[in-house]
Amino acid sequence: MTTPEDSARTAALWKPSAARAARSRITDYRQYVCRTRSLDLPDTTALWQWSITNLDPFWDSVWNYFDVAGSRGAGPALAKAEMPGAVWFPGATINFASQALRHAPSDAPAIIACNEAGDQLELSWTELAARVASLAATLRARGIVRGDRVAAVLPNSVEAVVAFLACASVGAIWSLCSPDMGAASVLDRFRQITPKALIAVRSYRYGGKIHDRSTVTAQLVESLESLALYITVPGPDDPGNTTSRSAHLATLAWQDAIAHDAALHIDPVPFEHPLWIVYSSGTTGLPKPIVNGHGGVTLELLKVMALHNDLHAGERFHWFTTTGWIMWNCQISALLLGATICLYDGNPGWPDAGALWRFADRVGLNFFGAGAAFHTGCMKAGVVPAGERLRSTLRTVGSTGSPLSPDAYRWLQSELGPEVWIAPISGGTDLSSAFI
């Protein structure tokens, strides 16, 4: 017998309006699959069942639906299904940066970057592509080639996105740490990957204070013997002049590294070629390096951003994160769809618990994600989350990092209104994505 308690547990917490469901990315994709594969998939449950029992045609349809920038190659999407050792898209060539920058040239914003001091920088797709092209040319000129590791210690800034895309353009392998980490913690990670280049900031702002990291970066430069190039990035109240030198490597200032007027050249790489290295938590020994490839990341995060998050080109996406959390990697993947990524660098609770919501209102977010602890903290602090502009733009609120409590869920839904989708997710660093 079904009890009232059972019914309450199984009842849907939220359903999209008929209009929102009709214009959603998942509906469009389901109709595309039915049309191109001669299938009858009446709803998303049927689509999900087809996707998990037909891996080869499903992932082939994902490539084709998004018209991925790259060469598909001949043969099946899944050439070898045995694990370990599965082989995906043999013969395909791709580059994450090609998909991300296919939306240039355009005067529309690719990045809106804000910090806790109130500074705001808007970078168009054309400007982003130009900076990436310039830095990639510098990396090539300084001997950085496909397969080299490029390590970075940067905040959640435009420079981090530009550096990552330039690294990917060359076919080098990216690895990033947050500037709040100590030298020992960074070295525990970077020593394992023997980077050839280091891009690091000398200071950063957090909680209303400027934190000098010049001593830490000097330790990294001297301790990473594999380095041949060091690009120093100015922080707040930093004149940007290159001051540190080392006998065993070339040192460049960031502004000099992006000063070239270069054509954008992105190297196509094999589907499985490494894109980035992230790390396990290090609770059992040294943090374990985890490698994800260009092809898998590009297809998976196109799928997640569009079909799971219902993100559209031109919309404004933000997930509060530091560069030490996998959500930084997920956030920048919104560029793959032509969405605008809205970065926030700083303490989300400074000068008060409403700071991040004011940022969301100022830039007019369509998707706003943060950790569950952040949402709970705002609820307890009595924050009014939605300003006038945000009430007209916000469609989805994401949550992760820990379970979102029922109280916090109900608070968000009550404050933001019934049309806003509250969407908690669960995933992992090892897959750079979410599985729930």
Question: What name fits each language-model region?
Answer:
Residues 35-40, 97-124, 237-239:
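AMP-dependent adenylate-forming
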Residues 107-109, 231-232, 245-279, 286, ...:
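Conserved pre-ATP/AMP-binding loop-to-beta segment of ANL
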Residues 194-198, 215-230, 317, 342, ...:
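Conserved helix-loop-beta element of the AMP-binding
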Residues 298-316, 326-366, 381-382:
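Conserved AMP-binding/adenylation subdomain of ANL enzymes
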Residues 339, 366-369, 379-436:
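Gly/Ser/Thr-rich phosphate-binding loop
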